[in-house]
């Protein structure tokens, strides 16, 4: 679905579900996908593989050719990891992650590269690129910096919602606040994906009303 000002296509978990799909490439090119625990798995991409970058750039450009609206205030392309922990551990990805102290090292480098090439291919000044700081990519990298047209969507899934995020006595939330501060130092487009209900048990009571106001004020 296309919104005039908003996301082009899906807004989450787009890598392998929308871009470089394994049902097209995995059998013939397993090297396009994550090397995890000694084998290639189709649940995530190998983000340092140059062919993967080429494919994703081409697929993004194809979507933009069809759906780009130059009159929109902003349109967002989501380049976001799938919902699992099967990140790539190949030599190149590991070296980049190690150099950045975070698996976000490969993700931000990948998104920066795709964004640069897409912008060079056409007049897409109102297009920005969105990625996650989520689970294994939640910690900010120490070397690579997101481009000005890259959004980092920081997810609070590991947080405690019985306390405010800035409660100094809550270890889970102290870790999140540290990550929020570190991302804020290197990125001017930090968005928040906050968890204001229990997605696993939607009908269960989720007593977070007392912390919601303060958490929004923090953001």
Show where each model-derived region lies.
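Short, surface-exposed, polar/charged, turn-prone segments marking secondary-structure boundaries
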Residues: 105-107, 156-162, 218-219
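Substrate-binding cleft/loops of secretory-pathway carbohydrate-active enzymes
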Residues: 130-158, 203-211
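Short, acidic/polar
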Residues: 59, 176-180, 208-218
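Active-site beta->alpha N-cap acidic-glycine motif
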Residues: 115
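Feature activates predominantly on carbohydrate-active enzymes
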Residues: 1-111, 119, 123, 133, ...
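Glycoside hydrolase catalytic-domain groove-lining segments
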Residues: 140-148, 154-198
């Amino acid at each position: 679905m296309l919104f005039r000002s908003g996301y082009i296509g899906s807004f989450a978990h787009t890598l392998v579900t929308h871009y470089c799909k394994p049902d097209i490439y995995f059998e013939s090119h397993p090297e396009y996908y994550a090397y995890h625990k000694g084998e290639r798995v189709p649940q995530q991409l190998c983000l340092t593989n140059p062919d993967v970058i080429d494919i994703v750039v081409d697929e993004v450009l194809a979507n933009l050719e069809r759906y780009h609206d130059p009159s929109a205030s902003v349109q967002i392309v989501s380049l976001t990891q799938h919902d699992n922990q099967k990140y790539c551990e190949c030599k190149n990805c590991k070296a980049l992650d190690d150099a950045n102290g975070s698996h976000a090292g490969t993700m931000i480098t990948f998104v920066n590269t795709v964004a640069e090439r897409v912008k060079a291919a056409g007049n897409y000044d109102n297009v920005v690129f969105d990625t996650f700081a989520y689970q294994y990519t939640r910690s900010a990298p120490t070397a690579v910096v997101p481009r000005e047209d890259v959004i980092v969507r920081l997810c609070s899934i590991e947080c405690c919602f019985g306390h405010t995020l800035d409660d100094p006595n809550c270890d889970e939330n102290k870790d999140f606040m540290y990550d929020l501060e570190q991302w804020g130092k290197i990125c001017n487009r930090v968005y928040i994906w906050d968890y204001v209900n229990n997605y696993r048990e939607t009908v269960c009571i989720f007593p977070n009303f007392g912390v919601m106001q303060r958490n929004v004020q923090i953001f």
